[in-house]
Amino acid sequence: MRVIIVSGRSGSGKSTALNVLEDNGFFCIDNLPAVLLPELAERALLHTELLEPQVAVSIDARNLPSQLKRFPELLAEVRTRYILCDLLYLDADDKTLLKRFSETRRRHPLTNENRSLAEAIRDEGRLLTPIKDLADLKIDTTHLNLYQLRDTLKLRLLNKPEPGTAFLIESFGFKKGMPVDADLVFDVRCLPNPYWKPDLRDFSGLDQPVADYLAVQPDVEEMYQDILTYLQKWLPRFAASNRAYVTIAIGCTGGHHRSVYLADRLGQALKQSLKNVQVRHRDLC
């Protein structure tokens, strides 16, 4: 049996996550009181004919603060029952969350006459710290639209064919911000940039003309070999420490050429020795 716990600040995409999971066969429960988590797990094990073998629940700041403080012990109790349990935490920066609430005109669950929206967003983050600190997977949705978030959730949560650590090699552009959920970040902005070649500018790092150009650049090849050697040595150590998810981010200026080329090439190479290797290009439209 598999249980996915979805948490995060309001406006970060929890409802979207539950919808994606429900569309893919999960029995979903929104706003579950945290104290009921062990009971739900026990009932699911005893009555498999009543519940799907895959269950997703959201637990967030709508819980009582006293229940949120107990979350670590409640999660540990569930995991002692030998249930595969993943904890997903979604978040975005304060400015983005403020904008989303302004656009949807929805009321934040913690706002009242004495607490502004900005204060509610900050307070919610503090309340959810016991959950965030235990998250197996953190996804920053600041730069993701609805469709990108759905694709990311499918990639990270549903495209995991074998047990063990899921590795994500992600390209990105620094001009749109560094991914805050990355475990390892490699800056490749020092490499020759195809953007300054007029005949290559409109291509991406996945296109053959750009790949051919970068493949013959000595610095690019040296950077690739150095990163690959590092990852081949240390990623198995991450897996041995029982990490559920590891994100490796490769960044260039715009996230279209150098980082895309290297992320794709690294992903293909790592798939030869590691299971569950995925590649994603964050800023490639």
Curated annotation (Swiss-Prot):
Q: For ATP, which residues are the binding ones?
A: G8, R9, S10, G11, S12, G13, K14, S15
Q: Name one GO molecular function term.
A: ATP binding
Known InterPro entries for this protein? P-loop_NTPase (IPR027417), RapZ-like (IPR005337), RapZ-like_N (IPR053930), RapZ_C (IPR053931)
- Kindly state which keywords UniProt assigns to this record, in alphabetical order: ATP-binding, GTP-binding, Nucleotide-binding
Q: List positions binding GTP.
A: D60, A61, R62, N63
Q: Give the Gene3D superfamilies listed for this entry.
A: P-loop containing nucleotide triphosphate hydrolases (3.40.50.300)
Q: What does this protein do?
A: Displays ATPase and GTPase activities.
- Similarity field: Belongs to the RapZ-like family.
| The protein, known as | Nucleotide-binding protein Avin_12760
Q: Which organism does this record belong to?
A: Azotobacter vinelandii (strain DJ / ATCC BAA-1303)
